[in-house]
Amino acid sequence: MKYLILAEKPSVARDIADALQINQKRNGYFENNQYIVTWALGHLVTNATPEQYDKNLKEWRLEDLPIIPKYMKTVVIGKTSKQFKTVKALILDNKVKDIIIATDAGREGELVARLILDKVGNKKPLRRLWISSVTKKAIQQSFKNLKDGRQYNDLYYAALARSEADWIVGINATRALTTKYDAQLSLGRVQTPTIQLVNTRQQEINQFKPQQYYTLSLTVKGFDFQLESNQRYTNKETLEQIVNNLKNVDGKIKSVATKHKKSYPQSLYNLTDLQQDMYRRYKIGPKETLNTLQSLYERHKVVTYPRTDSNYLTTDMVDTMKERIQATMATTYKDQARPLISKTFSSKMSIFNNQKVSDHHAIIPTEVRPVMSDLSNRELKLYDMIVERFLEALMPPHEYDAITVTLEVAGHTFVLKENVTTVLGFKSIRQGESITEMQQPFSEGDEVKISKTNIREHETTPPEYFNEGSLLKAMENPQNFIQLKDKKYAQTLKQTGGIGTVATRADIIDKLFNMNAIESRDGKIKVTSKGKQILELAPEELTSPLLTAQWEEKLLLIERGKYQAKTFINEMKGFTKDVVNGIKNSDRKYKHDNLTTTECPTCGKFMIKVKTKNGQMLVCQDPSCKTKKNVQRKTNARCPNCKKKLTLFGKGKEAVYRCVCGHSETQAHMDQRMKSKSSGKVSRKEMKKYMNKNEGLDNNPFKDALKNLNL
């Protein structure tokens, strides 16, 4: 008898097979005398579409809504049906005794496996492999601690409830809005509140009125003393009167106080923090960061599980620190890492906290030492950030003296504050940090002369527009960005992790860009006309982050066995009926403000121009037509004059590449330029691959052919 191991992806299945010495490669699985390991390809089974319940529902009609099946159906995904048949045969194989679920350790990973098992009709016992890294050592250790699969039943019920609720609400709200207003409009319990977040910030900026205020400082022996006051002076004359009082008056040092202080490193990275920092440092979007992180985790095996919301480690990981530090010796931080190898770490350190780790701990390096030359430029940047944060967390605190000098002049108090670094601690890892010395020349009781007075004018500034990094953080903590009627709602949002999950937020932002609900201009995310109209047309409940937080709260209760999934689904059905009725009875109108005179080549209706993340495209206004064509898009081809990225207009032989500097060239010229700078022939297919790549050519099968290009 054998154990069947079900992984989520082929790469993880290979890692498990390697760790357990399962060496016989079959068609769709690996095998030895004890184990069979196979894989899903993400989801192999999904919720049925409305037309799979009733073929008459293929056409979208408002009168057919709401669509609420009595029992939810699942179907095998067509493009991966071959692998499903392989997995099904293995599950039903009489040689298989138990099944070990080895999909991603989390709600969605559980759903991937259980939908397959339910579709097959599995009756065999289940075990659960729960891992946070796919290194050989981690896999072998986790196989010694397999859990009874029944312990994760509630996790599955929560995942299934989430999936079914999103289907019921999303399908009906989207079809209702689209058919009511004859436009491609989409609603969702996560995406719509996210549009509202962006819109709220945009309104705050538009309504902001700057105010002028003034500050006063004195210069004494080259040091600037600030007027000590909690008041913001909006009347310049008040400060001018103080300056007049100070003329020909000496000051007296009232006190010189020194307080020794410590500062501590930032928390270890969770996914959201890492995505935010990658955007802040390198302008790399959340989706791209997650994809790169997934590569570091699955392919290179140098970091732990990416989709985590925790900033902490569990206490049983203390003894693994030395191996992880040794792995970082391959990086530019080796000089800072070396002293830490001999250090003894304690579970009492602040980074270790079992109560603050749920499914997965913070993102840190594994014990696998990377081959730095194998990492792409983006992978290097990301890995370096993780290593930097990890090493900082293990280093001593930064220590400094906070010096406060108080000056009294004509009854007014002025203050000088300076920090003097005494111990670099974790800041030694940062370039430019050093021990500082302040030779402040003041002693208590000194009489001093004022060499200069300075009245400075300031202006209040509006909040900043969200960018892709800060929007992620806002989705995680929406209570900090919206007004709520009751403080308990803010607590609900905080406890449930806000809008979406750490694993889905990047996809949601990407989806909103693609559906033209939001756009980014110079890194500033704004709501489009379409996005604003969606908010106006959508039921108010669906625009609030509070609703999704309340749902998430119930899903967490289901996960803990404290709420019935059936009750939750019934609530969602009732909510959906109200949403559909509200849309049906609405007298509002939707206006296409981006309608063009270009006819759709498929149905003849006029097309609408929409902005995408990387350019513009024309989309048929008829939701059932789905015809699209690119108008322009950014490429990775470089201008030969200014080296900026070129924008592609048109397609095929008529395509033209243009640059902001004024340079332009035809497709034929671009092909010729590539060939002249390459050692070999470059096909149109290869050219297209090059244009579509988000990163360099490191992992491109045409790397050798294109390595001499200077585009």
From Swiss-Prot:
Keyword Nucleotidyltransferase: no
Site keyed Interaction with DNA: positions: W60, W167, R175, R307
GO process annotations (BP): DNA recombination; DNA repair; DNA topological change
GO cellular component, one term: cytoplasmic replication fork
Region (Interaction with DNA): 186-191
Binding-site residues for Mg(2+), renumbered to this chain: E8, D104
Keywords: DNA-binding, Isomerase, Magnesium, Metal-binding, Topoisomerase
CDD domains noted in UniProt: TOP1Ac (cd00186), TOPRIM_TopoIA_TopoIII (cd03362)
Pfam families attached to this UniProt entry: Topoisom_bac, Toprim
Domain Topo IA-type catalytic: 152-580
PANTHER family (UniProt xref): DNA TOPOISOMERASE 3-ALPHA, PROKARYOTIC DNA TOPOISOMERASE
Family: Belongs to the type IA topoisomerase family.
Main function: Releases the supercoiling and torsional tension of DNA, which is introduced during the DNA replication and transcription, by transiently cleaving and rejoining one strand of the DNA duplex. Introduces a single-strand break via transesterification at a target site in duplex DNA. The scissile phosphodiester is attacked by the catalytic tyrosine of the enzyme, resulting in the formation of a DNA-(5'-phosphotyrosyl)-enzyme intermediate and the expulsion of a 3'-OH DNA strand. The free DNA strand then undergoes passage around the unbroken strand, thus removing DNA supercoils.
Protein name listed in UniProt: Putative DNA topoisomerase 3
Gene: topB
